[in-house]
């Protein structure tokens, strides 16, 4: 998995994140959780398991729960044309 080429990603002071594609005027807004998941994936070279482990330590949360949430979120981003496999 990786982002499609040419994305523009902007993180706001509120913790929300805006993702835009070069071929569309649409924008995708992510809340603080989505922003944290995006950053974790970037830091872990888009390896889901490593990003889950990092977030579960940071949030002191069940890694399986985080993995489920991330998989749902990744599916949404893939459907939106932001991520590719």
Task: Give a label for each model feature.
Residues 1-35, 39:
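Acidic, low-complexity/disordered tracts enriched in E/D and polar residues
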Residues 29-85:
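Long, charge-rich, low-complexity alpha-helical segments
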